[in-house]
């Protein structure tokens, strides 16, 4: 037990130190980025049909996700590439979606004054699908070409199940959906940042308690937690900088990959309930509007405005009220997700870690 406790303390201490380092580094990069973005007028355009209270945000610096992505990239490369395959995958997905989001942000900043978007929705969707497909293959293929998950998933009351090749299309849809869901949620100051902090924190705990222990993935999650927490320093109401597609798409896709790597992706709708509900509200609103326009000749709406946070704004809630209440929901959801992982996860048989050179203690002996 002394060996077990020593390794657990060492792993958690390493993860928390990376979180603290990420917080400090992101604060430094963030201060520089806010000044740089203001100097070069990298200000966000606000949709004219949105809530009128948002018009005061016109010109607020955007693409703030660069401070999170760059911090995670630097610290992971320096301190958390022990098991290269398991870390290169979330890093690769993060960078790929960040580049896509950065180009989209840049096009929206430099395009026609009458437009607020960069890429067309269809073009961006197919690029995201392509990157997600490559990531899903990397998860499914055997080593050394992939991580050899072979479609494994933890199902409550059932245990570990191999869903075979079905894993690939499911993983693609999860990555694309969660990436867009986070992007949709990023419409109020600190709303996406807070819920990303909670979600990555939850998966950090889940991977720490997993069998075998996914210690590198845990350290990665807490690195993102520290970076997101520091981003909130600049994104708290009233925001000095917005995350932009650069950050929202990248962090959403990375969260999905982390969930898939942990084999606890069925818990993602629970842990990321705010993201899921925000995305579904937009899909329901759009679908219902199109159907009623076809059926009755005029489009009708279920919500006052989509996504859902705008609906509550138009009901009279202030922006801080919407954010705080959604964050409270996200906090409870994260706790429920961790509890479900503990209840329905595989039984602990001893100590296993994914780092080479560590003693492994199992139920049938040690090696």
Curated annotation (Swiss-Prot):
GO biological process terms, semicolon-separated: cell division; cell wall macromolecule biosynthetic process; cell wall organization; peptidoglycan biosynthetic process; regulation of cell shape
GO molecular function: metal ion binding; phospho-N-acetylmuramoyl-pentapeptide-transferase activity; phosphotransferase activity, for other substituted phosphate groups; UDP-N-acetylmuramoyl-L-alanyl-D-glutamyl-meso-2,6-diaminopimelyl-D-alanyl-D-alanine:undecaprenyl-phosphate transferase activity
InterPro entries in the cross-refs: Glycosyl_transferase_4, PNAcMuramoyl-5peptid_Trfase, PNAcMuramoyl-5peptid_Trfase_CS
Keyword Amino-acid biosynthesis found: no
Predominant subcellular localization, coarse grouping: membrane
Keywords of this entry: Cell cycle, Cell division, Cell membrane, Cell shape, Cell wall biogenesis/degradation, Magnesium, Membrane, Metal-binding, Peptidoglycan synthesis, Transferase, Transmembrane, Transmembrane helix
Localization: Cell membrane
Transmembrane segments: 16-36, 62-82, 87-107, 125-145, 158-178, 190-210, 214-234, 240-260, 264-284, 326-346
Pfam families: Glycos_transf_4 (PF00953)
Membrane-topology annotation of the record: Multi-pass membrane protein
A cellular component annotation (GO) from this entry: plasma membrane
Reaction(s) the record says it catalyses: UDP-N-acetyl-alpha-D-muramoyl-L-alanyl-gamma-D-glutamyl-meso-2,6-diaminopimeloyl-D-alanyl-D-alanine + di-trans,octa-cis-undecaprenyl phosphate = di-trans,octa-cis-undecaprenyl diphospho-N-acetyl-alpha-D-muramoyl-L-alanyl-D-glutamyl-meso-2,6-diaminopimeloyl-D-alanyl-D-alanine + UMP
Cofactor(s) the protein needs: Mg(2+)
EC code(s) of this entry: 2.7.8.13
Top-rank EC class of the record's enzyme: transferase
Pathway: Cell wall biogenesis; peptidoglycan biosynthesis
Role: Catalyzes the initial step of the lipid cycle reactions in the biosynthesis of the cell wall peptidoglycan: transfers peptidoglycan precursor phospho-MurNAc-pentapeptide from UDP-MurNAc-pentapeptide onto the lipid carrier undecaprenyl phosphate, yielding undecaprenyl-pyrophosphoryl-MurNAc-pentapeptide, known as lipid I.
Record-stated family: Belongs to the glycosyltransferase 4 family. MraY subfamily.
Protein name: Phospho-N-acetylmuramoyl-pentapeptide-transferase
Naturally occurring in which organism (per UniProt): Chloroflexus aurantiacus (strain ATCC 29366 / DSM 635 / J-10-fl)
């Amino acid at each position: 037990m002394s060996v077990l406790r020593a390794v657990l303390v060492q792993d958690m201490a390493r993860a928390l130190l990376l979180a603290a380092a990420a917080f400090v580094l992101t604060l430094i990069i963030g201060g520089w980025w806010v000044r740089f973005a203001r100097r070069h007028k990298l200000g966000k355009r606000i949709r004219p049909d949105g809530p009128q209270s948002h018009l005061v945000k016109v010109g607020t610096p955007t693409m703030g996700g660069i401070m999170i992505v760059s911090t995670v990239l630097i610290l992971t490369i320096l301190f958390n590439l022990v098991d290269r395959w398991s870390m290169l995958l979330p890093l690769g997905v993060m960078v790929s979606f960040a580049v896509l989001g950065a180009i989209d942000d840049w096009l929206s900043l430099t395009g026609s004054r009458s437009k607020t978007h960069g890429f067309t929705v269809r073009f961006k969707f197919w690029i995201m699908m392509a990157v997600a497909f490559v990531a899903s293959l990397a998860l499914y293929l055997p080593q050394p070409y992939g991580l050899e998950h072979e479609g494994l998933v933890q199902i409550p009351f059932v245990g570990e199940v191999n869903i075979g090749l079905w894993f690939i299309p499911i993983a693609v849809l999860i990555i694309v959906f969660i990436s867009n869901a986070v992007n949709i949620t990023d419409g109020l100051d600190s709303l996406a940042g807070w819920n990303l902090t909670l979600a990555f924190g939850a998966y950090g705990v889940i991977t720490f308690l997993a069998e075998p222990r996914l210690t590198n993935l845990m350290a990665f999650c807490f690195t993102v937690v520290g970076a997101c927490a520091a981003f909130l320093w600049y994104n708290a109401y009233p925001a000095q900088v917005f995350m932009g597609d650069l950050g929202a798409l990248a962090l959403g896709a990375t969260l999905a990959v982390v969930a898939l790597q942990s084999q606890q992706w069925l818990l993602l709708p629970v842990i990321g309930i705010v993201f899921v509900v925000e995305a579904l509200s937009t899909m329901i609103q759009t679908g219902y509007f199109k159907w009623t326009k076809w059926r009755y000749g005029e489009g009708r709406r279920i919500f006052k405005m989509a996504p859902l946070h705008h609906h509550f704004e138009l009901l009279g809630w202030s922006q801080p009220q919407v954010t705080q209440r959604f964050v409270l929901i996200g906090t409870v959801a994260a706790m429920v997700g961790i509890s479900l992982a503990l209840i329905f996860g595989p039984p602990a048989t001893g100590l296993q870690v994914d780092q080479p050179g560590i003693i492994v203690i199992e139920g049938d002996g040690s090696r």
